[in-house]
């Protein structure tokens, strides 16, 4: 994820002549989502509205991993590391990612993740251990 982010930043900066870090968030979001889809990694949706609460909610549709592995296996767990490395490159050190839902396991909200720092991730992991859905986790974190 980190190497992908570095290459992405270098190539976009060279092409556009404007640093990725100086772009409005809406442009950054559009470029990242286009990159994700263009690399065949599915359709990424980022909910930036929870940034002030210390986390980002992420949804991945049409993941290439959805049909791989035995039934009951968390198919997109490898994307946890890719997301963590990619977004960690653009953030403060210590950004972590937890998968909070998987379409293959029947999660109605689809394949979902939370990006946050350690304090929030501890809460996410605790809620996930209780089998709490992504939407409820997001609502609880957003109200803290």
Description of each model-found segment:
Residues 1-78, 96-144:
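N-terminal accessory segment detector
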